[in-house]
Amino acid sequence: MAKRYGTTGEIVGKRVLLDKSTPKKPEAVKRLGKVRHCVFHPTQRRFVGFIVKRPDLLWMFRRKDVFVAYNGYDVVDGRIVVSQAPEATGKGACKAMGVNYDDCVLWAGLPVMGEDGTVYGTVGDVSFDPKTGEVRSLTVTQGATANALLGVREIPGHLIRGFKRGIGTALSVNGQDEGEEPILGAILVSDEVAELSRMAGTDFTGFAKTNRISMQ
């Protein structure tokens, strides 16, 4: 059975190989690059794949990044090995999953916000089902000092509403011209998160009160 990772923390920074096996060379691989970002569905609570940064050609010419589907690779001896199948990478992967790559979102570092406008921190590690990509939970970070005092909170998947445009921080968008009004985005969570935090003994009411913004 194919093995795949189940958290963004396990994937980002990993070296990636491309399967180049043939009947005569069943273990042949080629270096592809290193995982730069994890990518999520624009409207669903789902991990769809990751972006691999390729090494520059002759240390001078930048090569295009490669998008790999969440199910387009196996973990072999601790290394990510990307399948040769056309639906494993690029446009083929997006077509197979029914997503538009330019609409997809990078969750890492986005603010985590309640429906009432409370900002709980930013997205840290995200856990998901390796077989489907469905998000199981995410951790919220408030910076090293706050994390040391309060601990890193985990928000279960059923309380995560998903990505929401128009609130939060400015996004990096493909094709956006300089001078255009920035597009904002955040990860929206249920207001039940505040109660969950108090029950877990990691109440951060003071932090939340100073980080409440209008949702209008």
Feature map (PLM): residue ranges:
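Peripheral interaction segments used for macromolecular assembly
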Residues: 1-216
